[in-house]
Amino acid sequence: ISSDTNTYNAAASGASGISSSSVKLEASGLSCSADLDAIFNEAASKYGVDAKFLKAIAKCESDFSTECTSRSGAMGIMQLMPQTAASLGVTNAYDPYQNIMGGARYISEKLTQYNGDKSLALAAYNAGSGNVAKYGGIPPFKETQNYVAKVMAYYNS
């Protein structure tokens, strides 16, 4: 993370090396502050998505950093793109509550769209539903393939 701009270089492997001072990482890599944990649990309950799955996405997207912005403009802990954030009613993508709730709603919609298939939902979260439709599954983009594998590895750990 660049301390002056709070940006990071979005890599195929996610946002490795980024951490927030409030994050406590343990063996599974999905442990976060109690405040964030409470938000993940509320979002999981509200949108019917496993809290561990939401945390796996956040771990891969931002390493639980609430203030980061990717090269492509994705913002906050769940790395919402501005247009997606707006469509989800997120007015401040750096607010952890709004961002996690928006990300949970979005992945819930993708899970519904793909009949509960987590890999396809993740591919759509990362590369867009249009690309999933175009390629009839996970797109042949290294970034997306690595992203799906990494999130699922965190989730299954």
Model regions and ranges:
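Export/targeting segments at the very N-terminus of extracytoplasmic proteins
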Residues: 4-64, 83, 97, 104
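Solvent-exposed, acidic/flexible segments
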Residues: 29-37, 46-47, 51, 70-78, ...
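Amphipathic alpha-helical polymerization modules
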Residues: 38, 42, 94, 105, ...
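A cross-kingdom feature marking charged/low-complexity
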Residues: 45, 153-157
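Short, solvent-exposed positions on alpha-helices
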Residues: 52-55, 119-123
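Substrate-binding/active-site groove segments that recognize
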Residues: 60, 67-90, 99-111, 123, ...
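Flexible, glycine-rich active-site loops centered on histidine and acidic residues
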Residues: 132-138
